[in-house]
Structure formats: C-alpha cells, structure tokens
C-alpha cells in the first residue's frame, strides 16, 4: 500500500517515538559511566565487604620483616660501608698511579738531563725454569664467602704475574678448577687466563696436578740452590712442639707421594730448604683463619707430607703470621734467588705487618737488629680481576721513545 506523504503522525505515535529515543540515550550513558550500570554492579559484587572473612592476598611490602641476627646485621653494615667507600678507594688508586707516573717521569728526565739513556740495560735476562712446582688447592669454596673467593682470584693472578717475572720460574697448577672461581675467570677475564704461560688449570685435585708436574720437572734446569739441597742437611726439621696437637697419632706419609709437600702453618715441620723435583701445595683458602687446621688435616688424611715456612725462626711479627697466597709464592721465588729465608721474608712481607728480622748478637756482644727492608704494600683488592698479560702489554705500548745523545 502506498503511503501518503501528506500524512502526519498522531500525538500518541510522537510520544511513543520520543520515549524510545530517551531510553536509548540513557542506555548509552549507562554503558559509558563506570560507576553505574551492570558492570559497576558486577564489580561491587566482586569487592568483599569490610566484614568479609575471605582471605586477602598480601603484597611483599605488607609482610613483616624477619629480624636479622647480630652477625648478619654486622655483615650487612660492613658490606654497606664497603660499597660506600668504593669511589674513595678508586680515587686513591688513581692518585697513587698518577703520583707513580710523575715520579718515574721525573727520574727519567733527570737521567736524560745527564745524557744517560733511561731505557738502557733495563731488559731483564730471560727467566730460568726450575724443577719446582706450586699447586693451588682450590677445593675450599664452600668455606668462603663471595668476597673471599674474589680475593683468592686476585691472589692467583698476582702469583702468576710474580712467577712470570721472577728470575727463577716455577711450574704453577690450579686444582679443582670447576666452581665459582672458574666461572668468575670465565666472566671477568673472558677466558684470557687460558693464554697464560707456565700455569695449568686442572679440574682434578692437587694429587692429579702433582702427577702432571712430576713428568714436566724431569726436563727443568737444576740451579745451584736446588743442587745443594741434594747434598746438604735435611730440607725440613721436626719442631719440638706441635702448633696444632691432634688426638690421633701422626700417620706415615705414603711413599708414592714423597715428592708432594702441603704447606700449612699448623704443620709441626719447618722448611729448611726447597727440594728439587717437588710439588708444594698451597691451600686456596681465604677465610680470616675461621677454619683452623683445615689444610693440615686434609693433607694428613691423604698421607701427604706437611711443612711450614720458617717465619718464626727469622722474623718477629707485630701482627698475625698468616700470609696471603701470593705472598707465599713470592717468598719461595725469592728464596730460589737469594737462598736465604731472611732476605726473602724482608723483601716480600708488607711493611704494615711490622715484620723485623730476629735480633742477632754483634761482634761486641751488644744486641744488633737488622733494619727492615722496605716492601711496598700491595695495592688494595680491586673489585675486578685484571689480566696481567694485558696490563704488561699496555705498559709497553705506552712507553715513550727518547733519543739521548751520548757524551
């Protein structure tokens, strides 16, 4: 049926149409307003009332903090102090390096002013490999904190550097190379230690390292100090009193390990000389002497000879006589050079420890005391282990060339 365009809707139809439009507008507003409508009612239904017994999930910030022990609080404060002083230590090391460079430059300029070539005759003779092996026993990580493991890594790095530049060079082995220390060298040094010469990193224990060293030492040079060790008195002496008495009797060393000596300050035997074709084991333990006698007991259980450096026979110390790993290595290297324990101790032990040679009777009967040789205090432990080969290479590259006219 055709609609008439002239037809007008009635009043009832207009009222109905207006009502439909108003209802549509209210529905749209209700959907847009989050505080009203079915969505708001749903959210209100989800939110529990104040008196609800439904358990609420508490955030980590709302959890009550567990009380810390005194030791844990003390460690936390020391760590905070260490972190707070990191920048100051960094600046001190930088100032020390600058002062050292200025001093060397002044000395060099003074020689040039005198017409002397400051670089003449500075090349050291090549090192001589000797039939002595030093083994770092690194099976003590469970007894050390992270900071102490970092310190041990730095000591091993310094030991390698000292041995590399020594007049008489030994073979160095690092045993039990499969823990956090190895992971640190992998991450910090990017495995550059694998290119170091004269040092082997072994996953096995120190006995496996000694077996490797036994074959290698057959072809080393027998220098005079070691040659005399074969003909003179016994290379070690039994002390009258045990530094660490144990209830069980001392076992006999196993004959197949007669060429292995475990160094320990708790040993009742004192080294008189270093023996050729012998491996000396150094405990890789940095624990501020918490684990008393750990290395000594470990050696006894394995049937290994033990000995300690003769510090008490030659030195008077104002502080504890426990030395770092790199100090032990340096002392043994110096003995090979001087063949004298007193000179070796004085050239290595830091001056801050207040070490002096024991009093000696003079010709006139008066007591004389040997003056303490100056030993530079080792630099403070760096936060990162550095590659000594890279540092040596950089030092050579930065050395300027100076032409000096001869007289």
From Swiss-Prot:
Bias-annotated ranges (Basic and acidic residues): 1-19
Binding sites annotated in the UniProt record for S-adenosyl-L-methionine: 263-264, 283, 287-291, 295, 309, 321-323
Annotated region described as Disordered, given as residue ranges: 1-105, 220-256, 353-407
Composition-biased stretches (Low complexity): 20-32
Biased composition (Basic residues): 91-103
Enzyme Commission designation: 2.1.1.221
Composition-biased stretches (Acidic residues): 368-386
UniProt key word Nucleus: yes
Chief subcellular location: cytoplasm
Active site: 287
GO molecular function: tRNA (guanosine(9)-N1)-methyltransferase activity; tRNA binding
A cellular component term, taken from the record's GO annotations: cytoplasm
Oligomeric form and interacting partners: Monomer.
Protein name: tRNA (guanine(9)-N1)-methyltransferase
Gene that produces this protein: TRM10
């Amino acid at each position: 049926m055709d609609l008439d365009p002239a037809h007008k809707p009635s009043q009832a139809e207009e009222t109905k149409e207006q009502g439909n439009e108003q209802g549509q507008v209210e529905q749209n507003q209700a959907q847009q307003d989050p505080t009203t409508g079915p969505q708001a009612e749903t959210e209100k239904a989800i939110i529990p009332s104040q008196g609800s017994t439904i358990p609420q999930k508490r955030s980590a910030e709302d959890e009550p903090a567990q009380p810390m022990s005194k030791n844990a609080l003390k460690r936390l404060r020391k760590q905070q102090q260490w972190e707070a002083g990191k920048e100051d230590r960094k600046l001190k090391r930088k100032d020390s390096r600058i002062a050292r460079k200025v001093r060397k430059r002044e000395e060099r300029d003074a020689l040039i002013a005198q017409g002397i070539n400051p670089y003449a005759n500075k090349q050291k003779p090549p090192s001589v490999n000797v039939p002595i092996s030093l083994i770092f026993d690194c099976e003590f990580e469970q007894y050390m904190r992270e900071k102490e493991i970092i310190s041990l890594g730095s000591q091993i790095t310094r030991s390698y550097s000292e041995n590399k530049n020594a007049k008489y060079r030994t073979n160095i082995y690092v045993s039990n190379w499969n823990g956090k220390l190895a992971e640190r060298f992998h991450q910090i040094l990017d495995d550059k230690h694998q290119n170091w010469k004269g040092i082997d990193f072994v996953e096995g224990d120190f006995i496996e390292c000694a077996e490797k060293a036994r074959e290698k030492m057959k072809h080393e040079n027998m220098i005079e100090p070691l040659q005399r060790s074969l003909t003179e008195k016994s290379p070690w002496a039994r002390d009258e009193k045990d530094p660490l008495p144990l209830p069980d009797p001392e076992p006999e060393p196993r004959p197949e390990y007669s060429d292995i000596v475990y160094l320990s300050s708790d040993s009742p035997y004192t080294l008189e000389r270093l023996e050729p074709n012998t491996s000396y084991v150094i405990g890789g333990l940095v624990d501020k002497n918490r684990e008393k006698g750990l290395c000594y007991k470990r050696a006894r259980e394995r049937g290994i000879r033990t000995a300690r450096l003769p510090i008490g026979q030659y030195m008077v110390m104002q502080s504890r006589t426990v030395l770092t790993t790199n100090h032990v290595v340096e002392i043994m290297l110096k003995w090979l050079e001087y063949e004298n324990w007193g000179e070796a101790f004085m050239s290595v032990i830091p001056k801050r420890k207040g070490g002096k040679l024991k009093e000696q009777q003079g010709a006139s009967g008066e007591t004389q005391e040997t003056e303490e040789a100056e030993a530079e205090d080792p630099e403070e432990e760096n936060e990162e282990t550095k590659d000594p080969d890279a540092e040596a290479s950089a030092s050579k590259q930065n050395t300027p060339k100076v032409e000096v006219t001869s007289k």
